[in-house]
Design a protein with these regions (language model features):
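A short, surface-exposed alpha-helical micro-motif characterized by mixed small hydrophobic
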Residues: 203-205
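Conserved ABC ATPase signature
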Residues: 136-140, 144
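The feature captures the beta-strand-to-loop junction immediately N-terminal to the Walker
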Residues: 36-38
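ABC ATPase "signature
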Residues: 221-222
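Conserved ABC ATPase "signature" region
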Residues: 113-131, 240-241
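Conserved ABC transporter NBD signature motif
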Residues: 58-68, 74
Length: 246
Protein backbone atom coordinates (compact mmCIF):
# COMPACT_ATOMS: atom_id res chain seq x y z
CA UNK A 1 0.00 0.00 0.00
CA UNK A 2 1.13 3.53 -0.79
CA UNK A 3 1.46 6.21 1.85
CA UNK A 4 -1.40 8.68 1.69
CA UNK A 5 0.06 10.86 4.46
CA UNK A 6 3.70 11.27 5.46
CA UNK A 7 4.76 13.54 8.30
CA UNK A 8 8.43 14.47 8.36
CA UNK A 9 10.34 16.36 11.06
CA UNK A 10 7.27 18.22 12.31
CA UNK A 11 8.10 20.76 15.01
CA UNK A 12 6.14 23.49 16.74
CA UNK A 13 6.69 25.61 19.84
CA UNK A 14 3.61 27.06 21.54
CA UNK A 15 3.39 30.26 23.60
CA UNK A 16 3.05 28.12 26.73
CA UNK A 17 6.48 26.63 26.02
CA UNK A 18 5.07 23.24 25.05
CA UNK A 19 6.80 21.72 22.02
CA UNK A 20 5.99 19.15 19.37
CA UNK A 21 9.37 17.54 18.77
CA UNK A 22 10.44 15.93 15.52
CA UNK A 23 7.16 14.14 14.74
CA UNK A 24 7.51 11.48 12.03
CA UNK A 25 4.95 8.92 10.86
CA UNK A 26 3.11 7.60 7.81
CA UNK A 27 -0.44 6.50 7.11
CA UNK A 28 -1.02 4.13 4.21
CA UNK A 29 -4.06 3.89 1.96
CA UNK A 30 -6.89 2.12 3.79
CA UNK A 31 -4.93 1.96 7.05
CA UNK A 32 -6.14 2.84 10.55
CA UNK A 33 -3.48 4.47 12.72
CA UNK A 34 -4.16 5.57 16.29
CA UNK A 35 -2.26 8.30 18.12
CA UNK A 36 -2.40 7.52 21.85
CA UNK A 37 -1.38 9.67 24.78
CA UNK A 38 -2.57 11.41 27.91
CA UNK A 39 -4.31 14.79 27.87
CA UNK A 40 -1.88 17.56 26.93
CA UNK A 41 0.56 15.26 25.12
CA UNK A 42 0.12 17.00 21.75
CA UNK A 43 -2.35 14.68 20.00
CA UNK A 44 -4.96 17.25 19.05
CA UNK A 45 -2.31 19.81 18.08
CA UNK A 46 -0.97 17.37 15.49
CA UNK A 47 -4.44 16.81 14.06
CA UNK A 48 -5.05 20.56 13.84
CA UNK A 49 -1.75 21.04 12.01
CA UNK A 50 -2.68 18.33 9.50
CA UNK A 51 -5.99 20.01 8.62
CA UNK A 52 -4.43 23.48 8.47
CA UNK A 53 -5.80 24.99 11.69
CA UNK A 54 -2.29 25.48 13.09
CA UNK A 55 1.03 26.23 11.42
CA UNK A 56 4.26 24.32 12.06
CA UNK A 57 7.72 23.61 10.70
CA UNK A 58 8.50 20.47 8.73
CA UNK A 59 6.65 18.57 6.04
CA UNK A 60 3.22 17.01 5.78
CA UNK A 61 2.99 15.17 2.49
CA UNK A 62 -0.55 14.34 1.40
CA UNK A 63 -0.44 12.27 -1.77
CA UNK A 64 3.08 13.59 -2.26
CA UNK A 65 2.27 17.31 -1.87
CA UNK A 66 3.49 19.35 1.10
CA UNK A 67 0.20 20.69 2.46
CA UNK A 68 1.97 22.86 5.03
CA UNK A 69 2.97 25.01 2.06
CA UNK A 70 -0.18 24.46 0.00
CA UNK A 71 -3.05 23.86 2.47
CA UNK A 72 -5.75 24.64 -0.11
CA UNK A 73 -4.67 21.59 -2.09
CA UNK A 74 -6.37 19.41 0.53
CA UNK A 75 -9.69 20.41 -1.07
CA UNK A 76 -11.85 18.48 1.38
CA UNK A 77 -9.94 15.23 1.01
CA UNK A 78 -8.86 15.33 4.68
CA UNK A 79 -11.80 15.55 7.07
CA UNK A 80 -11.94 15.82 10.84
CA UNK A 81 -14.57 14.53 13.29
CA UNK A 82 -14.56 16.34 16.60
CA UNK A 83 -14.98 15.16 20.18
CA UNK A 84 -18.25 17.01 20.69
CA UNK A 85 -20.56 16.36 17.72
CA UNK A 86 -23.19 18.78 19.00
CA UNK A 87 -20.84 21.78 18.92
CA UNK A 88 -19.85 21.03 15.31
CA UNK A 89 -23.42 20.58 14.00
CA UNK A 90 -25.22 23.80 13.08
CA UNK A 91 -28.26 23.92 15.42
CA UNK A 92 -30.23 25.93 12.84
CA UNK A 93 -29.86 23.28 10.13
CA UNK A 94 -31.89 20.15 9.68
CA UNK A 95 -29.90 16.92 9.54
CA UNK A 96 -30.40 16.58 5.77
CA UNK A 97 -28.84 20.00 5.18
CA UNK A 98 -25.97 19.27 7.58
CA UNK A 99 -25.02 16.07 5.76
CA UNK A 100 -25.36 17.55 2.27
CA UNK A 101 -23.73 20.94 2.90
CA UNK A 102 -20.21 19.76 2.05
CA UNK A 103 -21.45 17.54 -0.78
CA UNK A 104 -23.03 20.52 -2.54
CA UNK A 105 -20.29 23.05 -1.73
CA UNK A 106 -17.46 20.78 -2.88
CA UNK A 107 -19.41 19.42 -5.87
CA UNK A 108 -18.69 15.87 -4.78
CA UNK A 109 -21.22 14.02 -6.90
CA UNK A 110 -20.77 12.95 -10.50
CA UNK A 111 -23.46 14.08 -12.97
CA UNK A 112 -24.99 10.62 -13.10
CA UNK A 113 -25.34 10.38 -9.31
CA UNK A 114 -28.74 11.19 -7.77
CA UNK A 115 -28.36 13.28 -4.62
CA UNK A 116 -31.36 11.74 -2.82
CA UNK A 117 -30.17 8.19 -3.50
CA UNK A 118 -26.66 9.17 -2.44
CA UNK A 119 -28.00 10.59 0.83
CA UNK A 120 -29.96 7.42 1.62
CA UNK A 121 -26.87 5.30 0.90
CA UNK A 122 -24.83 7.42 3.32
CA UNK A 123 -27.50 7.02 6.01
CA UNK A 124 -27.43 3.28 5.48
CA UNK A 125 -23.64 3.26 5.74
CA UNK A 126 -23.72 4.89 9.18
CA UNK A 127 -26.80 3.11 10.53
CA UNK A 128 -29.27 6.00 10.56
CA UNK A 129 -32.94 6.00 9.51
CA UNK A 130 -34.26 8.50 6.97
CA UNK A 131 -36.77 9.73 9.57
CA UNK A 132 -34.04 11.84 11.19
CA UNK A 133 -33.45 13.95 8.07
CA UNK A 134 -36.02 16.58 9.03
CA UNK A 135 -34.90 16.76 12.66
CA UNK A 136 -32.48 19.20 14.28
CA UNK A 137 -29.32 18.24 16.21
CA UNK A 138 -30.87 18.94 19.63
CA UNK A 139 -33.55 16.32 18.92
CA UNK A 140 -30.99 13.51 18.60
CA UNK A 141 -29.13 11.38 21.14
CA UNK A 142 -25.37 11.70 21.56
CA UNK A 143 -24.79 8.54 19.55
CA UNK A 144 -27.06 9.74 16.74
CA UNK A 145 -25.30 13.10 16.61
CA UNK A 146 -21.95 11.36 16.37
CA UNK A 147 -23.29 9.23 13.50
CA UNK A 148 -24.50 12.39 11.76
CA UNK A 149 -21.01 13.84 12.13
CA UNK A 150 -19.57 10.68 10.59
CA UNK A 151 -22.17 10.74 7.79
CA UNK A 152 -21.34 14.36 6.96
CA UNK A 153 -17.65 13.47 6.84
CA UNK A 154 -17.98 10.31 4.75
CA UNK A 155 -20.40 12.04 2.35
CA UNK A 156 -17.69 14.28 0.86
CA UNK A 157 -15.65 11.22 -0.19
CA UNK A 158 -12.46 11.97 1.78
CA UNK A 159 -9.22 10.04 1.52
CA UNK A 160 -8.32 10.54 5.19
CA UNK A 161 -10.53 10.99 8.25
CA UNK A 162 -9.12 12.25 11.55
CA UNK A 163 -11.30 11.25 14.51
CA UNK A 164 -10.36 13.29 17.59
CA UNK A 165 -11.49 11.69 20.88
CA UNK A 166 -14.91 11.05 19.33
CA UNK A 167 -15.90 8.36 21.86
CA UNK A 168 -15.09 10.29 25.03
CA UNK A 169 -18.60 11.60 25.79
CA UNK A 170 -20.42 8.38 24.83
CA UNK A 171 -21.55 5.51 27.04
CA UNK A 172 -19.84 2.11 26.73
CA UNK A 173 -22.52 0.55 24.50
CA UNK A 174 -22.54 3.50 22.09
CA UNK A 175 -18.73 3.42 21.97
CA UNK A 176 -18.87 -0.21 20.85
CA UNK A 177 -21.51 0.61 18.22
CA UNK A 178 -19.48 3.51 16.81
CA UNK A 179 -16.32 1.37 16.65
CA UNK A 180 -18.28 -1.36 14.84
CA UNK A 181 -19.47 1.31 12.41
CA UNK A 182 -15.91 2.39 11.67
CA UNK A 183 -14.92 -1.25 11.21
CA UNK A 184 -17.64 -1.58 8.57
CA UNK A 185 -16.64 1.65 6.87
CA UNK A 186 -13.02 0.52 6.87
CA UNK A 187 -13.96 -2.69 5.07
CA UNK A 188 -16.35 -1.12 2.54
CA UNK A 189 -14.65 2.17 1.65
CA UNK A 190 -11.11 3.09 0.66
CA UNK A 191 -10.58 5.58 3.47
CA UNK A 192 -7.58 5.96 5.78
CA UNK A 193 -8.07 6.93 9.42
CA UNK A 194 -6.12 8.67 12.16
CA UNK A 195 -7.76 8.07 15.54
CA UNK A 196 -6.82 10.38 18.40
CA UNK A 197 -7.40 8.88 21.85
CA UNK A 198 -6.18 8.86 25.45
CA UNK A 199 -7.54 5.31 25.91
CA UNK A 200 -5.49 2.61 24.21
CA UNK A 201 -8.17 0.03 24.93
CA UNK A 202 -10.88 1.91 23.02
CA UNK A 203 -9.02 1.90 19.70
CA UNK A 204 -7.25 -1.44 20.08
CA UNK A 205 -9.64 -3.50 17.96
CA UNK A 206 -9.92 -1.18 14.98
CA UNK A 207 -6.28 -0.03 14.71
CA UNK A 208 -3.63 -1.44 12.39
CA UNK A 209 -0.81 0.52 14.03
CA UNK A 210 -0.37 2.53 17.19
CA UNK A 211 1.69 5.66 17.85
CA UNK A 212 2.44 6.48 21.48
CA UNK A 213 3.00 10.17 22.22
CA UNK A 214 4.33 11.71 25.43
CA UNK A 215 5.17 15.36 26.07
CA UNK A 216 5.02 16.27 22.38
CA UNK A 217 7.19 13.38 21.18
CA UNK A 218 6.31 10.01 19.65
CA UNK A 219 8.20 7.59 21.87
CA UNK A 220 7.01 4.26 20.47
CA UNK A 221 5.20 2.92 17.41
CA UNK A 222 4.32 -0.39 15.84
CA UNK A 223 1.53 -2.81 15.07
CA UNK A 224 -1.01 -3.30 17.82
CA UNK A 225 0.24 -6.87 18.23
CA UNK A 226 3.78 -5.61 18.87
CA UNK A 227 2.72 -2.82 21.21
CA UNK A 228 0.54 -5.03 23.38
CA UNK A 229 2.80 -8.09 23.46
CA UNK A 230 6.17 -6.33 23.84
CA UNK A 231 5.84 -2.66 24.82
CA UNK A 232 9.30 -1.10 25.01
CA UNK A 233 8.60 2.03 27.05
CA UNK A 234 7.39 2.24 30.64
CA UNK A 235 4.93 4.93 29.59
CA UNK A 236 3.34 2.54 27.07
CA UNK A 237 3.09 -0.14 29.74
CA UNK A 238 1.38 2.41 31.98
CA UNK A 239 -1.20 3.26 29.31
CA UNK A 240 -1.98 -0.42 28.86
CA UNK A 241 -2.29 -0.97 32.61
CA UNK A 242 -4.55 2.06 33.05
CA UNK A 243 -6.86 0.70 30.37
CA UNK A 244 -7.15 -2.58 32.25
CA UNK A 245 -5.71 -4.70 29.43
CA UNK A 246 -3.70 -7.76 30.37
Amino acid sequence: MKEILSIRNLNKTFESGFKLKNINFDIKEGEVVSLIGESGSGKTSISKIIVGLLKAEGQILFKGMNILKYPKKINGKIQMIFQSPYSSLNPKYKIKDIILEGVIYQKVLEKEENIDEYLLNILNDVGLDKEILNKYPHELSGGQRQRVGIARTVAVKPDLIIADEILTALDALTQIQILELFQKLKENKKISYLFISHDINVVKKISDRLLIIKDGEIIESGTKEKIFSKPEKEYTKKLIEISGIR
